[in-house]
Amino acid sequence: MSSVTVTLPDGSTLEVASGATVEDVAHEIGPGLGRDTVAGKIDHELVAKEEPISEDCEIEIVTDQSDEYLDVLRHTAAHVLAQAIRRHHPDAKLTIGPYTDEGFYYDIANVELDADDLDEIQAEAASIIDDDLDVERVEYDRADAREHYADNEFKREILDAEAAGDGPVSFYTQGDFEDLCKGPHVDSTGEIGGFEVLETSAAYWRGDEERETLTRVYGTAFPTESDLQEYLARREEAKERDHRKLGREMDLFSIPDVTGPGLPLYHPNGKTVLRELSEYVRGLNSEMGYDEVETPHLFRTELWKQSGHYDNYVDDMFLLDVNDEEYGLKPMNCPGHATIFNEGSWSYRDLPVRYFEDGKVYRKEQRGELSGLSRVWAFTIDDGHVFARADQIEAEVRRLMDTITEVLDTFDLDYEVALATRPEKSVGSDDIWEQSERQLREVLDQQGVDYDVEPGDGAFYGPKIDFGFEDALGRSWDGPTVQLDFNMPDRFDLEYTGSDNDAHQPVMIHRALYGSYERFFMVLIEHYNGRFPTWLAPEQVRILPVTDDNLGYAHRVKNELGDYRVEVEDRDWTVGKKIQQAHDDNVPYMLVVGDDEEDADAVSVRDRQEREGKGVDLAEFRAHLDSEVDGKRTEPDFLD
């Protein structure tokens, strides 16, 4: 029998028989590990412990102590949900039920569910878990599998697509339930300590709006009930912080039906925040030596064919015909920047050339995937591109790392860093990939950055450094990125004249400090719970006259505060009501002015933490405001 070589996480290797399973490898390593095996990772892909190994690979054993265990548990929980739904609605047609970052879902056809249904499904699922049913993998002949799903066109389509082939197909069973599935799963339903059905939504089969409409049932699961309750508490807090809710309450943005899906309108308050965000990175770009450029929203599709986007992204592009010529709204800014570079004549002494643009782009996401500002059709990227010599990459990346770290620290966002390396399908020589990955590693190591390596997760055109950050609720988001690109310079024939007077191709560096403004704005709304730092707040100071007799002085105080965003509360309300309203509006500072303050040419300062300081000299407050805003401090601190 032939053998294969498996490489373990520590770099050691084992020779095992071809066809041996992940579990067999675990037993080969040690009997204890074999008993504890839940699943495995083959070449970084999560697989069932029963998965056979037919070729040389890297392998990692997953136990209940592994980070991936939660994914496996939730995959089984999705089957528990499907089993409960089928018991409650025997006519329901099951489609797919994957695990997700926060739980799982199952898409079903031929049924609609209301709140009472969800309660009954929750109770049924609890019974299935209490029964501690064994979860077992079985294999069916392909013809038998098709016969099994004679009345389920969705499962038959999966058999003909993802599960296509000549061999048997795997199912997982638990009690009276079985489902077409490649795994992995835990050993029994009783391993699920906490289970909750969350909500439903509409979905489309295959994410295609032209296909069947389905009901998507969301749930989550954890090893313990206490883990579940902690999650549910965070989820309730997240609902209170939901940027869509706060966006309405604070008059930041709207997405009305009349404008179309995924096309946000920014109201004056929201635009104020976005303008401050833009001015901040504009200053950083200037310090780093970037020149601001601007490209149109619309290009001939010839540009997108040259860049490769037409081949890879045409289904996500908005296309239109103009005088029998095809144009496309830009899904990315980089081809425009490459074209600008190509319009010049460059020497090696001119490099690096750095461009940046707050560029609006358009991507046609499926309507069912659109959500507030997190997934939209039209969004703006703080896009930057560097055209550099290979020997300049390290210095450029180091400076970008410093700047990105400064940005995330400014907003008090915790972050993680990952180095994504060469994927199987890539462009560029081995030498330039090795050099580029080495340079990125050296930058990360020299700066003492704690980072993970994500093998094969780089873009096809070059390796990248990804920043993922966490908000105040501990949720993870994709953040800034630094990517090296060998593909676009080649496609656009970019060149510069080297010291040898020959033509050379520059390396292109893509970078974004925020990513999408929309996504970053959404994160900040929820991260701060609408309580923006003073420098970002749409209204920084509200002046509260005690009576109408103090209105004149209130306006004089406003004038003294110059260009700050200051409003005078002139409604005929009590001071208490004015203070409460300012708190509700998340205004950082309130200045109460009555006869005593007017006589002393002073103000009484209150902040949104409900602290108060009486008889404050206005010049003193103004000087502190200057310092707080210039320093971009995260909380009002005059009264500290």
From Swiss-Prot:
Domain TGS stretches: 1-63
Catalysed transformations (reactions): tRNA(Thr) + L-threonine + ATP = L-threonyl-tRNA(Thr) + AMP + diphosphate + H(+)
Region (Catalytic): 242-533
Sites where the protein binds Zn(2+): 334, 385, 510
Required co-factors: Zn(2+)
Family named by the database record: Belongs to the class-II aminoacyl-tRNA synthetase family.
Cofactor stoichiometry and binding remark: Binds 1 zinc ion per subunit.
Lineage of the organism: Archaea, Methanobacteriati, Methanobacteriota, Stenosarchaea group, Halobacteria
Quaternary data: Homodimer.
KW Nuclease (keyword) present: no
Gene source species: Halobacterium salinarum (strain ATCC 700922 / JCM 11081 / NRC-1) (Halobacterium halobium)
Disulfide bonds: none
GO biological process: threonyl-tRNA aminoacylation
Keywords: Aminoacyl-tRNA synthetase, ATP-binding, Cytoplasm, Ligase, Metal-binding, Nucleotide-binding, Protein biosynthesis, RNA-binding, tRNA-binding, Zinc
Domain of life assignment: Archaea
PROSITE patterns, per database record: AA_TRNA_LIGASE_II, TGS
Regulation: Inhibited by 1 uM borrelidin (BN).
Primary role: Catalyzes the attachment of threonine to tRNA(Thr) in a two-step reaction: L-threonine is first activated by ATP to form Thr-AMP and then transferred to the acceptor end of tRNA(Thr).
EC id: 6.1.1.3
Record Pfam families: HGTP_anticodon, TGS, tRNA-synt_2b, tRNA_SAD
Any one GO molecular-function label of the UniProt entry: ATP binding
Top enzyme class: ligase
Name of the protein in its database record: Threonine--tRNA ligase
Gene name of this polypeptide: thrS
GO cellular component terms listed in the entry, alphabetical order: cytoplasm
Primary localisation category: cytoplasm
InterPro entries: aa-tRNA-synt_IIb (IPR002314), aa-tRNA-synth_II (IPR006195), aa-tRNA-synth_II/BPL/LPL (IPR045864), Anticodon-bd (IPR004154), Anticodon-bd_dom_sf (IPR036621), Beta-grasp_dom_sf (IPR012675), TGS (IPR004095), TGS-like (IPR012676)
